[in-house]
Amino acid sequence: MNKQALSDFIRQEMSGWKPFEVLLLVFCVGAQLLLLIQTSAPLLDAISGITGTICVVLVSKGKISNYFFGLIFAYTYFYVAWHQNYIGEMNSVLYIYLPAQFIGYFLWKANMQKDNAGSEEVVAKALDFKGWAILLVSLTVFTLLFIEALKAAGGSSTSLDGVTTITTCAAQLLMILRYREQWLLWIVLNVLSILLWWEENPSMRVMYIAYLVNSIYGFYNWTKLQKQLKA
């Protein structure tokens, strides 16, 4: 990609932002930077928190550039989870987050649309009744099985870790397949992740609080994107 193409891509990705969305991004990143200064958090934690925050805000906007920041987040978050011995989180990064960045990019690339302002955003879909039934049954079965596997492996916080890992898998799959219901799972996941990291890591705690706010907005915005497709 030459300089002009890169410049055009960045300009395209930054177009169509509402004032609230800009404030949301500034607030989320600012919270991470403030925490870094106050607590002298490890640099890797800070990089993970900041890139992860930028990534999810871009996802809520339906911007394909989220995958660049998601890739950086995945690499750094793996080592943060490794330090805390969260086996489930490590596996979710290694087998879900990392592959999803590459798969998701190409699936999204083939399914983009332009809004009235000419800004390019992803084409969003919604689950039907059958899709919901498959999702709920799969979540229940795989969560129970994975919790038992974590206990056998000697992981920390196995029940909570197991729930968050399987929920992450499902939400990530819905994300790369462009379903708006991913955001309902992200809301649940972010609440659970706040509990998981509450005592262990302030940087991760702040990151997931920012994620929770963004996921609520993400569901709202993707509902609008999905209605645009129906229209």
Model-derived regions, located:
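Hydrophobic/aromatic-rich structural module bridging two neighboring secondary-structure elements via a short loop
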Residues: V59-L107
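Short, hydrophobic transmembrane alpha-helix segments
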Residues: A31-L43, S60-G62
